[in-house]
Regions:
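Sequence/structural signature of long amphipathic alpha-helices
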Residues: 1-92
Length: 92
């Protein structure tokens, strides 16, 4: 691999890591926010134990977003490990 290719690859990795960091922060903030909301005694002025349509939909939506973010964070961690392994191989 010549120097131009290495520089290009470095820029690609830098941009990719930047996007990973942004996504990771976004997911962590969503999970934190959802956790705080779920600690509240009511959603939309409706007791959590009274599962009307609005409350039930909100609870499931928050759970779904939280689960998506958790899954995405796991994928990001795996991708970081994979990229570091690829980087080590290329540096050898």
């Amino acid at each position: 691999m010549n120097e131009t290719e290495k520089e290009h690859l470095k820029k690609v990795y830098t941009a990719y890591y930047s996007q990973i960091d942004f996504t990771k922060d976004f997911c962590e903030q969503n999970i934190k926010h959802i956790t705080n909301i779920q600690k509240q005694p009511t959603y939309c002025n409706t007791p959590l134990f009274k599962f009307d349509g609005k409350t039930t939909a909100l609870v499931y939506t928050l759970y779904s977003v939280s689960q998506i973010c958790t899954d995405l964070l796991e994928h990001i961690e795996n991708e970081i490990v994979r990229l570091s392994e690829v980087s080590e191989v290329e540096n050898d």
